[in-house]
């Protein structure tokens, strides 16, 4: 393919699509640029694998630090494991792309987006999402696109399309919307308690802008002569469908209408139907029967056909009868219970949140500024002081499997709950602690990420973190059959698995703090998205009421948490406080058993579980950094002796010299006649010369001054 460049004027900013220049062996590739940000996106396919029942799509977002003119740290000086933010962008690309491939497709598909250049004004993530659609179209894959994504910010009362990093950090909204000609397909947002009406308006604003990028992709494909591919699905196995349907339809309906069954009971009943009514019946067929031969060769045919029938019957029950598998109404929340302080007080704060069979235990830990996470990626922020980690062990769903490091799902769910709480956390200057919350999913039946939001709120309040408002969350679902649409409140596992939407909404009583919407269909009208947001509000408020019944206000700071004291020193004195090789600051730590962190601006944070130790460290640092004045009296220790005098450490890291003539009244023959190394002496600052050298004396000190100096030193 020859090089081709298409420019799009998009809200006053140019977006360039360059094809035919890079990655000639990829199925399709595009370099998408805006400003000085450039992202190379490729889409490649390989022949399918036998015996799988899922779409083998792999999406990778890669960051290269050369894009920002930086060399990686570490011994190897090269990029290692993708940072968390890169994993989140991989998910951001995957989520709108996955539902646009035919679900019967079994070819391996890999989409790789690599940031080659970074402009601090233009984030690369939404460019990568749009680029994934372009690359896939160029690769000639079956794809229900085009698809595009935009970001919307809110500064003051104005929505901003594709805001800069600075506008994002200073605004009240960070919203990413992906859409197709059929509607909205993905939403990701963090907001500062934004009212529902404003969020809906922002999504509508985004979807209108998306249409320009969709039309640009269509125009590009037309210019390049690329035809849209719409492959036909494989023929259905009507014989197997009829065989299974005739034997199990009524029995499945009966199970789905047994509202007293919990998740495990329902799963067991459905497994029993499959085993006795299908598998045994097929095994009873003659060995050469076509149906038996077919299912023997492809055992997953039975599972897939049975699941498809169960899905159809469950959806029909919801659409036609307005009843869910557990008997709830469409807008009804499962039973909720909450507890705080469920762990011993060695833990700073804990909260247990139960919603139906979903149970999340969240634990809050308060640390010092030195515990902040340093970020080594392309994002301009250099550290995080609030961390949320989400764990999903196999026992939470009654399974056994090896325990691994967190996967993309765990990282994504943790980031969503983190984003939901950020707007209500106290500012650093009011609450200098670094905060880590870990959410342990102990039992899962849907909406564990929103359970983590609720559990985190309980744990933070239990730890004594003065959050502005409590935050709750609910997961909304959707069943769409033709023109019939049903929105479900607080979906459980089977409704998530067999439904068309998973829409997580978190916020306070005043507004939304986080959104995440994923679809299994090719798009949803903005009006339906708006209805889901509105329906989530009473559910969130109901959950908030249950939470505040247990803990209405943050408690006093946990007695197990370190006590922090903060002081400011002259940045020029930081080196003196640290000392050569860290000697001075280590001495303070050993002497007081307090942890000391010093920021580049001279902010010193002192942490200790004992207030007295923190105060002692504070006095030491204040004394050693205060400006010395002639006439000040100190109680110090002789550190070394020379022929003409003795050096005395009057505070950690600061020494002065007593000339031999100032050691005592009258003539002194030898310094050693008056003092020895290790002696503790009272001295007065006699002079500070123009080089900053401190001259001391033992003469002319009043007994009251000496006594005060001894007390101050202690």
UniProtKB/Swiss-Prot annotation:
Cell compartments where the protein resides: Cytoplasm
Cofactor(s) the protein requires to work: Mg(2+)
Domain (S1 motif) ranges: 631-699
Any one GO molecular-function label of the UniProt entry: 3'-5'-RNA exonuclease activity
Residues that coordinate or bind Mg(2+): 496, 502
Gene Ontology BP terms: mRNA catabolic process; RNA processing
GO CC annotation: cytosol
UniProtKB keywords: Cytoplasm, Magnesium, Metal-binding, Nucleotidyltransferase, RNA-binding, Transferase
Residue ranges that the Swiss-Prot or TrEMBL entry lists as coiled coil: none
EC number: 2.7.7.8
Catalysed reactions listed for this entry: RNA(n+1) + phosphate = RNA(n) + a ribonucleoside 5'-diphosphate
Primary localization: cytoplasm
Pfam families, per the entry: KH_1 (PF00013), PNPase (PF03726), RNase_PH (PF01138), RNase_PH_C (PF03725), S1 (PF00575)
Domain KH stretches: 562-621
InterPro entries the record matches: ExoRNase_PH_dom1, ExoRNase_PH_dom2, ExoRNase_PH_dom2_sf, KH_dom, KH_dom_type_1, KH_dom_type_1_sf, NA-bd_OB-fold, PNPase
Function: Involved in mRNA degradation. Catalyzes the phosphorolysis of single-stranded polyribonucleotides processively in the 3'- to 5'-direction.
Cited PANTHER family: POLYRIBONUCLEOTIDE NUCLEOTIDYLTRANSFERASE (PTHR11252), POLYRIBONUCLEOTIDE NUCLEOTIDYLTRANSFERASE 1, MITOCHONDRIAL (PTHR11252:SF0)
Family: Belongs to the polyribonucleotide nucleotidyltransferase family.
UniProt-recorded name of the protein: Polyribonucleotide nucleotidyltransferase
Lineage: Bacteria, Bacillati, Cyanobacteriota, Cyanophyceae, Oscillatoriophycideae
Gene assigned in the entry: pnp
